[in-house]
């Protein structure tokens, strides 16, 4: 009998019934499955839990942050412009309201760089959600990086 209040993370794919010993094994299996479906080769996660996937012009970083229990997908868009920042920030917030689906624009304060990001709990993450997040981050970045650079100038 399973304890419904067991706080242990669940690393399993609901669609296939496959279970995994840890989050990295699960995400590596999802990366391999994604690569096979896309007809390409992708590197598995490195020792730090990172790999990169190219989607159109977007380079999507896949980060397994096991200590925090999350999957973080990040794709660089452009540096924050030196001028017109209020208008730029408003544009990013407006786009993040609906145009980015499950992703959002974010800014890395240390690098002063704009990213498209998606963050999900690792426990209970199934392949379809992984694929959807990867596709969404790639699509949003690919769609908006050139538009925003043209509109606000790339530094």
Segment roles from a protein language model:
Residues 26-29, 87, 91, 132-143:
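Long, highly charged amphipathic alpha-helices
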Residues 49-51, 69-71, 112-114:
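Hydrophobic residues embedded in beta-strands of well-ordered beta-sheets
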Residues 69-70, 81-82, 123-126:
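A short local loop/turn or secondary-structure capping micro-motif enriched for an aromatic residue
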Residues 74-113:
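Short, internal acidic amphipathic alpha-helical interface segments
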Residues 100-135, 139-155:
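Well-ordered alpha/beta subsegment
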